[in-house]
Amino acid sequence: MPADELNHSLSWIVVVGDVFGRPGRKALSLGLEKISSQRRVVFTVINGENLAGGKGVNTKTAQECFDMGVSVITTGNHLFDQKGVIDLLQKDGKVLRPLNYSSLCPGVGSGIYVLDNGLRVGVLNLIGRVFMAPSDCPFHAADQVLSGWSDQGISPDLVLVDFHGEASGEKRAMGFHLDGRVAAMYGTHTHVQTNDLEQLPGGSWYLTDVGLSGPHWSVIGVAPEMALSKYRTHVPAPFTVGEGELLFCALLLGISSTSNGVRIEKAELFREVFP
């Protein structure tokens, strides 16, 4: 089947990595608009820990993304950098916090979302422990949720896992740990899209990092002059979001439903720079 014909025959899940500040939200809007004009998008998940000024998420920025068609927002280490986020976490389960934070932490780190076509998509939001602040074991946390869904007879049609981590080795290990039990495991946090999208031996799709959506000419979102000043002088510099051209990075998952279940037929990286 020709590529264009296959693209139109599938339903698509759009996975967007760290959306950085106002430029990231604009890039998100432009990117989703372009993808939706070419494919039938049924579900969109983004990492929103940098939505508000590059640090954290608040009600205004989250709602702006939901108005664009975003289904679920995952987060990471900057989750609590904005006021009012606890109310957001306790609202409706559409903004997740890292699953392997303390059980006393407000909000939830996983959810099952029912689409208009009846498809049930599970999302897990994990955070790494290598070169990151202390947290509970992400491997055990993932096992608990997946086995819990299975024991209750509510396992979703497919599961997506956002592993928000610094170390590629830790992400890779999680990929193999979950292989065959989830549809896709992808990394966020480093803001650099990696070129290692592949299907693991057990059938799960894996990507080390989806990449940044935000200012293209920046140091992972920050204005270059600010980042350079800090690196060269060791003197803390004001945190300033970069400007100019917009970069949009995403992972696209084309899914089909048959009598044998739901499966990912096609996975591809998407990267575009908007003027």
Tell me what each language-model feature is.
Residues 2-275:
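Acidic, metal/ion-coordinating pockets
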